Amino acid sequence: MVGGTRSARVVGRSALSPRVTELTLAIEGDEPFRWLAGQHVTLRPDLPSGAPAAFSIAAAPSQTGLRRLALALSNGSALLAHTEVGSLVGLEGPFGAFTWQPAPSALLVGAGTGLAPLRAIVHDALGSDEATPVVLVAGNRSERDLLWHAELATLASEHLRFRYEPVVSQPDATWRGRRGYVQEHLEEITAGLAPGFRAYLCGSHGMVNACRELLGKLGVTEERIGYEAAA
């Protein structure tokens, strides 16, 4: 069902980082909720004044089945004030074409909660029969702020065709990984990708535009770049 309105119940809330909360929603009713990794939904609190807001689904259908969704919300989101465990929200969607496309290899670049749809795409790609190499570049302020950091590092250790490259802009003295902003590392990272790779970008407008500009200078055409940007 695309664009239909469903009800979903909040069945889980957990801290992904000091700034982000993960919500788990259980779809009400008998009909399965079908989506593609990378798509998003619009949520509306079950209140007369509840303003709708769009959120990317942070899980692939193969992870949660067709009855549950996982979303990542910044702690400043007004929606969090009305989504205690047990509460109902209206749900519309799924929407969007920010989904997996066949290519010799894939570059995924996300910052902040922009990592949510990319996490879904990673799980979907690794769970398929394809052998496409996938590189995920994930940016945030500090190691504590990196979303699903341990999970993604574990996936990289378990799948030879998946590489995880976390980048921290405000590292402490113990950080041994990449420093700065994601776009500052793309030239080096893309040098190891197969020609004709496809890029997926998700984050702030500034990050997405900087990555698009750099990839263009590296010869990546707009047709090979999928992106979603938020303010």
Residue locations for each model-derived region?
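Short, Lys/Arg- and Gly-enriched loop/turn segments at beta-strand edges
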Residues: S49-A58, G96-L108
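Reductase modules of NAD(P)H-dependent flavoproteins
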Residues: V2-S7, T132, V137-A231
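Short, glycine-rich nucleotide/cofactor-binding loops
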Residues: L107-L115
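Ferredoxin-reductase
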Residues: V2-S87, N140-S142, V167-Q170
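A short, well-structured juxtamembrane/interface segment
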Residues: G76-L79, L91-W100
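Short, conserved phosphate/pyrophosphate- and ester-handling motifs at nucleotide-, phospho-/glycolipid
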Residues: G38, G114, S204
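Histidine-anchored nucleotide/phosphate-binding helix
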Residues: L115-G127
